[in-house]
Amino acid sequence: MDTDEQGAPGRKPLDRPQTPDELKFYARNYVMLALLAMILFLPFGILAIYFSIQTNEANKCSNWEDAYRNSSRTMWFNMLAIVAFVGIIYILVLVL
């Protein structure tokens, strides 16, 4: 394996700069929301950060299907972390 390669094993970085049309297709990575999710509920937050990084790598390689799939997964784990945090707080308030 070449040491100059970046990203996941199945992805090859582009050997040219991305065109403005390609840049329009960038999937959102929700990195700030993923950081908040990591603070609120660590297990789902870590997964959200992981898929956010995968989204960035897929965007850089113009692999739009993977980018949008990982972006969706990032958002789901962000929402799960927030719901889990609210649920834990709700249970703690009911018990105490």
UniProtKB/Swiss-Prot annotation:
Instruction: Summarize the protein's role.
Output: May play a role in spermatozoa mobility.
Tissues expressing this chain: Specifically expressed in testis.
Q: Where in the cell is it found?
A: Membrane
Q: Which UniProt keywords apply?
A: Membrane, Transmembrane, Transmembrane helix
* Residue spans crossing the bilayer: 31-51, 76-96
Question: Disruption effect?
Answer: Mice lacking Pmis2 are viable but display male infertility despite a normal mating behavior. The ability of spermatozoa to migrate through the uterotubal junction is impaired. Their binding to the zona pelucida of eggs is also altered.
Q: Which GO biological process categories is it annotated with?
A: binding of sperm to zona pellucida; single fertilization
Keyword Membrane carried by entry: yes
GO cellular component assignments:
membrane
Q: State the annotated membrane topology for this chain.
A: Multi-pass membrane protein
Please give the name of this protein: Transmembrane protein PMIS2
Superkingdom of the source species: Eukaryota
One short Pfam name that applies is CD225
User: What family classification does the UniProt entry report for this protein?
Assistant: Belongs to the CD225/Dispanin family.
Q: Which organism is it from?
A: Mus musculus (Mouse)
